[in-house]
């Protein structure tokens, strides 16, 4: 699972996901990308499941880039705990994804293979996504 090696603060406030992504909206490493259309928290397990799905379909061909990183801890109180007595312990890590963000990129495979790999990866994610091709791609 992806998670930071160390953080300044163990627990964070939940915050809100307003507006569109300001950066990370262009395909910059590969030729194909998977773009988020809805805002969401993507957990490290979901990122890993999507990565495994893409790798299994693409086999040894091509390269995959993960453009999001789960750097936000989400805390949770134990089951059947009374209110109060502080905030719960960090339970899992999430990446805050806003609309327009490129989450995954791929290169070194045909457009058909990349489309199918991203389709399988999108099934593992809790949001609507769109397949993006780099503007200067010729294939």
From Swiss-Prot:
This is Large ribosomal subunit protein uL16. The gene is rplP. CDD domains: Ribosomal_L16_L10e. Part of the 50S ribosomal subunit. One of its GO terms (biological process) is translation. The keyword tRNA-binding applies. It comes from Chlorobium phaeovibrioides (strain DSM 265 / 1930). GO terms for molecular function: rRNA binding; structural constituent of ribosome; tRNA binding. One of its GO terms (cellular component) is cytosolic large ribosomal subunit. Binds 23S rRNA and is also seen to make contacts with the A and possibly P site tRNAs.
């Amino acid at each position: 699972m992806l998670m930071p090696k160390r953080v300044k603060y163990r627990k964070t406030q939940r915050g809100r996901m307003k507006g569109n992504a300001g950066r990370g909206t262009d395909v910059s490493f590969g030729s194909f990308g998977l773009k988020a259309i809805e805002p969401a928290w993507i957990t490290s397990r979901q990122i890993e499941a999507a990565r495994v799905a893409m790798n299994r379909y693409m086999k040894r061909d091509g390269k995959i880039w993960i453009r999001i990183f789960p750097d936000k801890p989400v805390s949770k109180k134990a089951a059947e705990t009374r209110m109060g007595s502080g905030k719960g312990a960090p339970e899992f890590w999430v990446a805050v994804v806003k609309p327009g963000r490129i989450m995954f990129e791929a290169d070194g495979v045909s457009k058909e293979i990349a489309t199918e790999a991203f389709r399988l990866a999108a099934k593992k994610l809790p949001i609507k996504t769109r397949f993006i091709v780099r503007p200067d791609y010729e294939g």
